[in-house]
């Protein structure tokens, strides 16, 4: 006989936030992954709107290709780079590891800037 399946615990946002904020690479990689997924969703909606002829998305002030290039190059990619660098620089330079108060403002500001950028593209 097999043992009964253990019940899946309920989603706990506080626990997720604690785990994500436990190290610089987790926070910034999470922000970068979120940025990439949001960009893919936005880009898919833009392309579907252009292909179908329906006005599914408000037209951004920038051409969609330029907005994609700016968002990926200057906002999504730096989150991955900073996540890596904030994790390895202390070890490479013989410094003590950063505390949460060093990298939480960095990750939060980068993600907030990215969300505001996409909010502007959506006309919010």
Predicted regions and their residues:
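Hydrophobic alpha-helical transmembrane segments of multi-pass integral membrane proteins
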Residues: 1-124
């Amino acid at each position: 006989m097999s043992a009964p399946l253990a019940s899946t615990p309920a989603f706990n946002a506080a626990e997720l936030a604690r785990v994500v904020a436990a190290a610089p690479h987790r926070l910034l990689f999470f922000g970068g992954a979120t940025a990439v997924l949001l960009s893919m969703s936005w880009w898919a909606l833009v392309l579907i709107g252009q292909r179908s002829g329906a006005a599914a998305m408000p037209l951004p002030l920038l051409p969609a290709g330029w907005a994609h290039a700016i968002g990926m190059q200057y906002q999504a990619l730096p989150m991955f780079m900073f996540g890596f660098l904030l994790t390895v620089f202390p070890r490479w330079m013989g410094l003590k590891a950063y505390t949460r108060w060093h990298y939480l403002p960095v990750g939060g500001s980068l993600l907030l800037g990215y969300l505001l950028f996409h909010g502007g593209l959506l006309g919010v």
